[in-house]
């Protein structure tokens, strides 16, 4: 079997799919994207195609190494996201050829189900509480919400009070009936993170995500030393070599590699194993589409340290398409009591509606994250 063609499709709301075709008619799907940089990743995918056309798709490890090492310059969000989507599609092909789901090819299940959590948007506490109530009605009891808006390097007590007030009202409304993580999106400086974490402790969030940027990862162990709240990060780390440094330094309780950013299934399975060796939990980052989610689930079901799975149903970014709009076998992604079950169809287990993909790719928007500025006009972290 040989790879004959690679096609990319930019899609709403902010996704990109790729299709790898073979001379025997077997097709694999992947999801390579950096949100707001889809065209750049798309160009990288087609550059990598030079290494792939005419090659045997079964040699996933060799093709991965060729893409990673053959160009001398390597790593980073663009190239690792391109590799990630290609890698997903290669595993999809392998599973279809062998008539087995990817988790079966990786040694089989370590669990029967994995808890899902849902994003909750809203700028005011009442909106967040209303969003949680609606999601509880369809079975969710675990959530993630933004921890704060933009925050200055040294900000005032009003900014701290606003962040804490939202969390306090949520805990008052629901008590211990729900769990929630707080995503700070790297918006907070190390000095302000210390203040916020101390103020949030009484409300027992499930985790705090990206309290500081990955570029300031040296602060993770320092922040962890002053709190009992688990600290999570990893969506902006792109290889096992980056994760190696933070695992060795300590501080993170939960790793969040993104299967569409960090080299795909092949790389993230290695990252999961590294995390287990350090007694660190795994919770793959996934505010993206169905192929990315499927890839995450296959890792979850073969990794003992996986604890819960992010998914994008109803997320505030989903304008123009929802999580399963491009999927024919929607029933396979249904949740029972807020848990996903293993995908059982061969390969990734996603039956893509190719006609719909082609149609909506003709008018896909170039999604950009907002540009935020502080009151003084300086650029803020989004």
Curated annotation (Swiss-Prot):
Record field: catalytic activity: D-galactonate = 2-dehydro-3-deoxy-D-galactonate + H2O
Enzyme kind, highest EC tier: lyase
Cofactor: how and how many bound: Binds 1 Mg(2+) ion per subunit.
Site, Increases basicity of active site His: residue positions: 258
Record pathway: Carbohydrate acid metabolism; D-galactonate degradation; D-glyceraldehyde 3-phosphate and pyruvate from D-galactonate: step 1/3
Cofactor(s) it depends on: Mg(2+)
Record-linked PROSITE patterns: MR_MLE_1, MR_MLE_2
CDD domains linked to this entry: D-galactonate_dehydratase
Stretches assigned to coiled coil: none
Keyword Iron-sulfur: no
Keyword terms, alphabetized: Lyase, Magnesium, Metal-binding
Described function: Catalyzes the dehydration of D-galactonate to 2-keto-3-deoxy-D-galactonate.
Extra remark beyond the main annotation: Reaction proceeds via an anti dehydration.
Full protein name: D-galactonate dehydratase
